[in-house]
């Protein structure tokens, strides 16, 4: 019964991809161990190569045992196993979010190396119920309350084939087949809000969880049938994103869309322009929407961005000064800087540093800069935007600002593209 439900789910989610290989994320818990055995049956049946991936966050002594166990199972199933390691650098602030992002970075980068297009994860029905309650508690908008069984990360499709299967069925499957799993001790800690919600739900009658699941399904249907198509149309019609890392929003076209769609567009733009991975707070977005509705010019800072209304357009560019991006050494052919720009050098260029323009640097080369094009595009906000662009240095000397075609000689050649690591459950931006 369980396998038939899983098989129906995964075939519907993958569709006619014609895959020859697939990857699966396994942690050692009952959810992912069940998924591993179910996916193994399905992969053999469909002649698909299955890669098993685990990530050690180096936070619990038990993780070594878990990884060894996953390795053993993978070997017994004749599947290739990859154990990746997340370096927390002894920085424990905002650790859950950083660990999640680091985990997905590691796994999807490996998928790209293996030429794998799809990664399976073990999110099950109980996880969806918990997420809905968490987001409801945080006053999330309707897009935030929705869930998805498919999303993209680093151009890899993440699929959750256990979405409608409760944890109890997965545990029952393992018990019946005498398969061992590990319990993560941190799941019992009251330190995390999710665990408190999980404990409360455990004490409730099953019909309560069923009602939450029903509300989740209704929300998802509304998003899929009405709001998601409107969101895609709104982005296509009202948004212009420039290679300099700023955007203009046409407020006349923007005004015709529902408030839920408007809020999500503002959120998307703030994530992309700021280079951050997390969403902006809903109350911050609501404040911006209120300012827009007043039909007056304004300037505000939200989520690491400057938002400026100029008549019927909204300009958004990165805020600079409070949190400056780290310098990066360009050793290889290309590097991502500020989570927003991809800089590529030619083979003749020696190792150099990618950083931001300081006031001293600006004063030294000011007379040599041609900012006319940027000035016209940005409605005379060129000076502020200039300081958000990547510059290239060798031995503390500015040798290039590729965006404005500034080079101190004819030898250097760099290509720069605006390529934020933007992740969305509703639209896929490469």
UniProtKB/Swiss-Prot annotation:
InterPro entries: Rossmann-like_a/b/a_fold, TilS/TtcA_N, tRNA_Ile_lys_synt, tRNA_Ile_lys_synt_N. GO terms for molecular function: ATP binding; tRNA(Ile)-lysidine synthase activity. ATP binds at residues 27-32. It is an enzyme of class 6 (ligase). Signal peptide: none annotated. It is found in: Cytoplasm. One of its GO terms (cellular component) is cytoplasm. Its EC number is 6.3.4.19. GO terms for biological process: tRNA modification. Keywords: ATP-binding, Cytoplasm, Ligase, Nucleotide-binding, tRNA processing. Its main location: cytoplasm. It holds the Pfam family ATP_bind_3. It catalyses: cytidine(34) in tRNA(Ile2) + L-lysine + ATP = lysidine(34) in tRNA(Ile2) + AMP + diphosphate + H(+). The N-terminal region contains the highly conserved SGGXDS motif, predicted to be a P-loop motif involved in ATP binding. Belongs to the tRNA(Ile)-lysidine synthase family. Ligates lysine onto the cytidine present at position 34 of the AUA codon-specific tRNA(Ile) that contains the anticodon CAU, in an ATP-dependent manner. Cytidine is converted to lysidine, thus changing the amino acid specificity of the tRNA from methionine to isoleucine. This is tRNA(Ile)-lysidine synthase. It comes from Rickettsia prowazekii (strain Madrid E).
């Amino acid at each position: 019964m369980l396998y038939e439900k899983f098989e129906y789910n995964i075939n519907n989610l993958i569709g006619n991809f014609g895959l020859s290989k697939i990857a699966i994320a396994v942690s050692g818990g009952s959810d992912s161990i069940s998924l591993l055995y179910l996916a193994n049956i399905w992969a053999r049946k469909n002649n698909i190569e299955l890669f098993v991936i685990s990530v050690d966050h180096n936070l619990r002594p038990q993780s070594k045992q878990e990884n060894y166990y996953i390795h053993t199972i993978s070997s017994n199933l004749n599947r290739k196993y990859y154990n990746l390691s997340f370096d927390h650098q002894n920085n424990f602030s905002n650790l859950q979010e950083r660990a999640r992002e680091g985990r997905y970075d590691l796994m999807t980068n490996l998928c790209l190396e293996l030429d794998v297009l799809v990664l399976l994860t073990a999110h099950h029905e109980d996880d969806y119920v918990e997420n809905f309650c968490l987001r409801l508690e945080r006053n999330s908008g309707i897009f935030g309350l929705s869930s998805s069984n498919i999303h993209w990360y680093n151009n890899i499709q993440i699929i959750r084939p256990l979405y409608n299967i409760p944890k109890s069925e997965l545990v029952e499957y393992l018990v019946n087949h005498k398969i061992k799993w590990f319990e993560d001790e941190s799941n019992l800690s009251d330190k995390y809000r999710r665990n408190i919600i999980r404990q409360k739900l455990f004490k409730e009658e099953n019909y309560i969880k069923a009602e939450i699941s029903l509300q989740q399904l209704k929300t998802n249907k509304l998003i899929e049938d009405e709001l998601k198509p409107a969101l895609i149309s709104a982005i296509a019609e009202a948004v212009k994103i420039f290679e300099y890392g700023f955007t203009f929003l046409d407020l006349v076209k923007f005004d015709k869309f529902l408030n839920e769609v408007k809020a999500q567009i503002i959120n998307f733009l703030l994530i992309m322009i700021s280079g951050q991975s997390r969403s902006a707070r809903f109350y911050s977005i609501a404040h911006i929407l209120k300012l827009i509705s007043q039909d007056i010019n304004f300037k505000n800072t939200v989520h690491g961005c400057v938002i400026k209304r100029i008549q019927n357009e909204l300009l958004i560019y990165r805020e600079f000064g409070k949190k400056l991006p780290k310098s990066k050494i360009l050793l290889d052919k290309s590097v991502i800087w500020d989570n927003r720009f991809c800089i590529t050098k030619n083979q003749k260029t020696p190792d150099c540093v990618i950083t931001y323009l300081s006031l001293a640097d600006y004063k030294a080369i000011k007379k040599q800069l041609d900012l006319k094009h940027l000035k016209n595009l940005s409605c005379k906000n060129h000076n502020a935007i200039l300081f958000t662009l990547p510059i290239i240095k060798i031995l503390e000397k500015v040798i290039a600002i590729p965006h404005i075609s500034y080079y101190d000689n004819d030898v250097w050649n760099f290509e720069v593209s605006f390529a934020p690591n933007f992740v969305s459950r509703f639209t896929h931006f490469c």
